[in-house]
Amino acid sequence: MAKEIKFSDSARNLLFEGVRQLHDAVKVTMGPRGRNVLIQKSYGAPSITKDGVSVAKEIELSCPVANMGAQLVKEVASKTADAAGDGTTTATVLAYSIFKEGLRNITAGANPIEVKRGMDKAAEAIINELKKASKKVGGKEEITQVATISANSDHNIGKLIADAMEKVGKDGVITVEEAKGIEDELDVVEGMQFDRGYLSPYFVTNAEKMTAQLDNAYILLTDKKISSMKDILPLLEKTMKEGKPLLIIAEDIEGEALTTLVVNKLRGVLNIAAVKAPGFGDRRKEMLKDIAVLTGGQVISEELGLSLENAEVEFLGKAGRIVIDKDNTTIVDGKGHSDDVKDRVAQIKTQIASTTSDYDKEKLQERLAKLSGGVAVIKVGAASEVEMKEKKDRVDDALSATKAAVEEGIVIGGGAALIRAAQKVHLNLHDDEKVGYEIIMRAIKAPLAQIAINAGYDGGVVVNEVEKHEGHFGFNASNGKYVDMFKEGIIDPLKVERIALQNAVSVSSLLLTTEATVHEIKEEKAAPAMPDMGGMGGMGGMGGMM
């Protein structure tokens, strides 16, 4: 297929047109008074959203060069959301403003490479000032404020997220699910839970709830399949002398071994239960080690030179309470050494930092949560499917932004933090580097201006008023008042502001230093020819019908 090449100003102007269209669609969602965007779906009802990244993801333009510009900024919005959970609209507004200012200067003859260098220096200096101005998230109230703002000022969602984080800690896993009704709910699972239930319902101790509960129990951990009773008989005899219940976690327990355990359980000889080990392959081995660390036990594995026949009671883990239903096993109050658990947590955190796979990262974070806190499930309720999807997206974003706030701290919100940081930056640059520096200094005013415009105020007037003051002074777009942003609880995670600015400068630099674009030429398909009508004999005789 033939391809068309566009050069210099012609290419950059078309790229800018794509960025402008994306920006115009996304910017309306910004701030507490942001508007909704209605998105047509390929099937079913259209979706309504105030989430910038959800709008950006839907945009495809007909002009191939303009579409390339839009797709690059869309990628920035997505990466900002992935890294910080919020700030997608901020990143888009910044990218557009930087590109617009930069394009004007480059068209007038500025050197793109020098301009880029000045932009990078300005952004780095502003980020350093943001870090200095940030403060650590103190308590539940500040977490509620961050979550509320990220959930588009929904205080109920903010409170749910704060409650969840309080219960499972900053390393705990918080998942978001759809509720069956219209009310929002929070469920918290204490201890370590994995998705394996009892191997036989005859292990049940509570017939009403259909659960097996073992108190002050031993835990046998092995990566072997147990099919013969003689494999575990010596260990069973030793635990019977101790008079404590036993949970067996193995690759599988089948045949004679399972039958014998069930019969002895029913006769009251053994207080026992058995479940399959969680996970598969290498992940199963790691999860067994996690349980061993949590309970102070040892995985009995032939790889380590250990066999079930020769296993001692010292190899068994211990837990205060174990609850098993048909789908899940929960281990509460594991008796492992706290130092061993901390070491294991640190090891998993290192693996999370080094892995590039999103799937592996998610599974590692689940393991981390099970070791360090627990799992909280926020169940989102809504009256319709459209409302449910929109609300669930907001909760996901608010959750990520709140974690970002806990991780790196908070700054004043409402677009004021960037302006305050810029007021403290004074770089002595020359020529086109100075042009790049000034581009950033003007562009960082755009988020505050857009928040004000969406709330029905004059963006320029609001920016000028905020610039006259120092400290935590900013603009509350919800009521149109100038306030102390920290006192009013209008705050943003530092990580969100930092990543939004870094990503915006990065993509704008790429676009401004683009000198050519290459795209396929769409071949217009010729319209199908009219079918040959033939003679259509007999038509001439129609005159007699007059």
Curated annotation (Swiss-Prot):
InterPro entries: Chaperonin_Cpn60_CS (IPR018370), Cpn60/GroEL (IPR001844), Cpn60/GroEL/TCP-1 (IPR002423), GroEL-like_apical_dom_sf (IPR027409), GROEL-like_equatorial_sf (IPR027413), TCP-1-like_intermed_sf (IPR027410)
Catalytic activity: ATP + H2O + a folded polypeptide = ADP + phosphate + an unfolded polypeptide
GO terms under biological process: protein refolding
Keyword field contains Isomerase: yes
GO molecular function (one): ATP binding
Keyword Isomerase appears in the UniProt entry: yes
Subcellular location: Cytoplasm
Family stated for the protein in its record: Belongs to the chaperonin (HSP60) family.
Assembly, per entry: Forms a cylinder of 14 subunits composed of two heptameric rings stacked back-to-back. Interacts with the co-chaperonin GroES.
Protein name according to UniProt: Chaperonin GroEL
Species of the source: Helicobacter pylori (strain G27)
Gene: groEL
